[in-house]
Amino acid sequence: MGYPEVERREPLPAAAPRERGSQGCGCRGAPARAGEGNSCRLFLGFFGLSLALHLLTLCCYLELRSELRRERGAESRFSGPGTPGTSGTLSSPGGLDPNGPITRHFGQRSPQQQPLEPGETTLPPDSQDGHQMALVNFFIPKEKSYSEEESRRVRRNKRSKSSEGADGPVKNKKKGKKAGPPGPNGPPGPPGPPGPQGPPGIPGIPGIPGTTVMGPPGPPGPPGPQGPPGLQGPSGAADKAGTRENQPAVVHLQGQGSAIQVKNDLSGGVLNDWSRITMNPKVFKLHPRSGELEVLVDGTYFIYSQVEVYYINFTDFASYEVVVDEKPFLQCTRSIETGKTNYNTCYTAGVCLLKARQKIAVKMVHADISINMSKHTTFFGAIRLGEAPAS
């Protein structure tokens, strides 16, 4: 019990059932009984367990080997040339890490300190140590050459560093220590002086010239605030002429009291025996010979007329027209009772848009009629109402 023994793997008892299972179970397509099927599954279970144990042993072996390499490498870096264990061999346990797994295994109690189980015998100490090293060399056959090369490299480094000075060993010891975690970042240093000004850069490519086309006008802005009232201007002189022009212009013509027979006394049937009662000379002009009334100013005019007629056995109705530039504008017709000499009046009126230089007149339609030019019953006139409305 004081030293590790080589594990002796005896043949598993499941080998025999494997043969039996291969012969009796239905692995090759033959029909198998229920008992043979159970033995086949039992064999497969033992086989899987054995394979898992082999894999676990292999993993432990690889872990032990890597741990031993790390310990040997660390010891060869820190130990001197005369220190035991730097020879790179496994001839003595002193070359191993005292805290390593192999050293702990070797440092177990000796057969004198541990109780023996029944049937075990003790070995001498020399034979025990030799047996232990043989086991280690058996498991790790390649560690010997690796350790020897490592020890030679350490000796060469020691010789080269001994000539460097008194600080050499201290630096080697510092280099051999494991580096701790990095500390926190220090505060930033002061800014350095400004560097020299660099050369001027390459001038850029000139931009594309813009167009001279003006864009569409924007929407009108909001109205500004109302300004203060201005100073009162001087009072102007009253324009009497303007006041007169704004007043309505009137013309009124009436008969002179004569009796007229149209067929014998009138030329073209137009009445011309008029007397002026009132007339604005700036707006109207009367032509006495032709009996026409001329308009001098554009505007809207109200035109009216009345004629008194009487019957002399020639016709049974009376009719006349108000013409503008010899074109009929208004017409008035009145029937007369035959066989009597009754007097009858006929009145008409209307509004007309007239332009300057236009002429208006009263024209009789039938020639076989007589007219009484009384100032109270026969008259003709016009009133200017104002400017013509904008079209």
UniProtKB/Swiss-Prot annotation:
InterPro entries: TNF_dom (IPR006052), TNF_Ligand_Superfamily (IPR051748), Tumour_necrosis_fac-like_dom (IPR008983). Residues 180-229 form the Collagen-like domain. Glycans are attached at residues 313, 372. The chain crosses the membrane at residues 42-62. It comes from Bos taurus (Bovine). One of its GO terms (biological process) is animal organ development. Homotrimer. The homotrimers may then dimerize and form higher-order oligomers. Residues 76-96 have a biased composition (Low complexity). It is a single-pass type II membrane protein. Residues 249-385 form the THD domain. Residues 1-28, 73-130, 145-245 are annotated as: Disordered. Residues 63-391 are extracellular. One of its GO terms (cellular component) is extracellular space. Cytokine which is involved in epithelial-mesenchymal signaling during morphogenesis of ectodermal organs. Functions as a ligand activating the DEATH-domain containing receptors EDAR and EDA2R. Isoform A1 binds only to the receptor EDAR, while isoform A2 binds exclusively to the receptor EDA2R. May also play a role in cell adhesion. Residues 181-203, 216-228 have a biased composition (Pro residues). Residues 1-41 are cytoplasmic. Gene3D superfamilies: 2.60.120.40. This is Ectodysplasin-A. N-glycosylated. Processing by furin produces a secreted form. Keywords: Cell membrane, Cleavage on pair of basic residues, Collagen, Cytokine, Developmental protein, Differentiation, Disulfide bond, Glycoprotein, Membrane, Secreted, Signal-anchor, Transmembrane, Transmembrane helix. It is found in: Cell membrane. Belongs to the tumor necrosis factor family. Residues 1-21 have a biased composition (Basic and acidic residues). The record marks 159-160 as: Cleavage.
